[in-house]
Amino acid sequence: MENIEQRVKKIVAEQLGVNESEIKTESSFVDDLGADSLDTVELVMALEEEFECEIPDEEAEKITTVQQAIDYVTAHLKK
């Protein structure tokens, strides 16, 4: 099974139409990967579906980089 980081990067690549090799953990969805506000909403929805968790809007707004998405999922999967 893929680890969380690999799964998050795969989702980001699919949602934003970027090559997985271009995605680094410090990549910003908007500044580095060209996402707009709709992309980020769809990305959060894809993460929720993949990891079967709910990400409240106020938390989703704080997730702006790949690493923040990985950290959020990691923290909330263990609960």
Swiss-Prot record:
Residues 2-77 form the Carrier domain. It is found in: Cytoplasm. 4'-phosphopantetheine is transferred from CoA to a specific serine of apo-ACP by AcpS. This modification is essential for activity because fatty acids are bound in thioester linkage to the sulfhydryl of the prosthetic group. One of its GO terms (molecular function) is acyl carrier activity. GO terms for biological process: lipid A biosynthetic process. Pathway: Lipid metabolism; fatty acid biosynthesis. Belongs to the acyl carrier protein (ACP) family. This is Acyl carrier protein. The gene is acpP.
